[in-house]
């Protein structure tokens, strides 16, 4: 989101990381809310692992040529993100989104356990949320901060997700008619 930043691979990386977030969200919902059986969780864990590897590959193949070429219009995007106050966020992101899920999702036990898969995917989702802030915020702020607007947007998203789940399950009392059942059936 820098005016002079240019990268041909950024769109592909953003698309693949969005798919990674979708797969992690699907596995998270299946583990915590849908109470899926172990075989389905194992398949979702394998897909999450595959998208983790693909996203890590895309980020590495995005950063390596920029670092090697050292072109000012490309390097200017990464300079504030790897120096100063943003360095620790970069390290946390590398662990939460790229390097952490890889060894933890390699075990069969982690992919078949609701608690482990749900915990791993929740860390991935939080890491990807922080990564979106990491992509945008250094252009506007010199030091990292998560304020009320960022937290309220995240709370609104999770609230809408929970509300849609409650509506889909027919458990929200305001949408229930005693004689006809759930409205819309």
Question: Predicted segment positions?
Answer:
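Hydrophobic alpha-helical transmembrane segments
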Residues: 87-98, 153-160
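Hydrophobic, well-ordered secondary-structure elements that form the walls
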Residues: 57, 101, 132, 173
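Long, contiguous internal "core" modules enriched in hydrophobic/ aromatic residues
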Residues: 1-93, 103-106, 179-182
């Amino acid at each position: 989101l820098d005016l002079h930043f240019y990268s041909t691979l950024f769109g592909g990386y953003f698309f693949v990381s969005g798919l990674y977030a979708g797969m992690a969200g699907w596995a998270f919902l299946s583990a915590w809310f849908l109470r899926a059986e172990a075989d389905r969780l194992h398949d979702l864990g394998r897909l999450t692992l595959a998208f983790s590897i693909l996203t890590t590959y895309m980020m590495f193949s995005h950063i390596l040529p920029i670092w090697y070429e050292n072109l000012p219009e490309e390097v200017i995007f990464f300079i504030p993100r790897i120096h100063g106050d943003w360095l620790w966020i970069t390290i946390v992101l590398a662990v939460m989104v790229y390097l952490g899920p890889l060894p933890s999702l390699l075990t069969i036990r982690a992919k078949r356990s609701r608690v482990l898969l749900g915990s791993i995917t929740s860390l991935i989702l939080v890491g990807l949320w922080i990564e979106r802030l990491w992509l945008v915020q250094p252009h506007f702020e010199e030091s990292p901060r998560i304020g009320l607007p960022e937290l309220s947007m995240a709370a609104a998203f999770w609230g809408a997700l929970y509300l849609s789940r409650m509506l889909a399950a027919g458990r929200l009392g305001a949408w229930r008619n005693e004689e006809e059942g759930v409205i819309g059936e």
